[in-house]
Amino acid sequence: MSQVTDMRSNSQGLSLTDSVYERLLSERIIFLGSEVNDEIANRLCAQILLLAAEDASKDISLYINSPGGSISAGMAIYDTMVLAPCDIATYAMGMAASMGEFLLAAGTKGKRYALPHARILMHQPLGGVTGSAADIAIQAEQFAVIKKEMFRLNAEFTGQPIERIEADSDRDRWFTAAEALEYGFVDHIITRAHVNGEAQ
């Protein structure tokens, strides 16, 4: 047994919930089940790196039930997904909103799934600006750059023209699992033990 597995398997003192997540981690399953923030991002990035180090040839499954959250934290997760040599299969369950939608669509093409009653929300990246007039101008400029990059990436993930991504993101837009499949956020709707490649 490898050192990293030994370290991960030491579950003494963990709560029942923690023990469940540790058991899932041993099966290469990780969860984003809350708002995306720096703490959550650090945990998910560490788990992805750990699993990739253990076996670069096996998929990692990322289940997402999230209202979204921090852009910088979400982009840290995304960059780690890209960095990992193994495929990252993503699953929408419950709600994949905002940054949750972005990470869902960022999964390995052909391995992006939605459960039948999942809801997906796409909208413009949100960011507040504070400080002096000069600081506000700098923050606004940086936010515009980030927003443009996220539009570009979402267009790449979905196969939609960037102009459509920009237009559809202008206001909150919700998608059912079937609509998300048609739009290109996911590749399959999964029900029980089988996968449906077409909207149902």
From Swiss-Prot:
InterPro entries: ClpP, ClpP/crotonase-like_dom_sf, ClpP/TepA, ClpP_His_AS. Keywords: Cytoplasm, Hydrolase, Protease, Serine protease. GO terms for cellular component: cytosol; endopeptidase Clp complex; plasma membrane. One of its GO terms (molecular function) is serine-type endopeptidase activity. Its main location: cytoplasm. It catalyses: Hydrolysis of proteins to small peptides in the presence of ATP and magnesium. alpha-casein is the usual test substrate. In the absence of ATP, only oligopeptides shorter than five residues are hydrolyzed (such as succinyl-Leu-Tyr-|-NHMec, and Leu-Tyr-Leu-|-Tyr-Trp, in which cleavage of the -Tyr-|-Leu- and -Tyr-|-Trp bonds also occurs). GO terms for biological process: protein quality control for misfolded or incompletely synthesized proteins. The active site is at 98 (nucleophile), 123. The keyword Thylakoid does not apply. It is found in: Cytoplasm. The keyword Ubl conjugation does not apply. Its EC number is 3.4.21.92. HAMAP family: ClpP. Cleaves peptides in various proteins in a process that requires ATP hydrolysis. Has a chymotrypsin-like activity. Plays a major role in the degradation of misfolded proteins. Degrades anti-sigma-D factor (rsdA) when present in a complex with ClpP2 and ClpX. Does not seem to act on anti-sigma-L factor (rslA). Fourteen ClpP subunits assemble into 2 heptameric rings which stack back to back to give a disk-like structure with a central cavity, resembling the structure of eukaryotic proteasomes. Forms a complex with ClpP2 and ClpX. Belongs to the peptidase S14 family. This is ATP-dependent Clp protease proteolytic subunit 1.
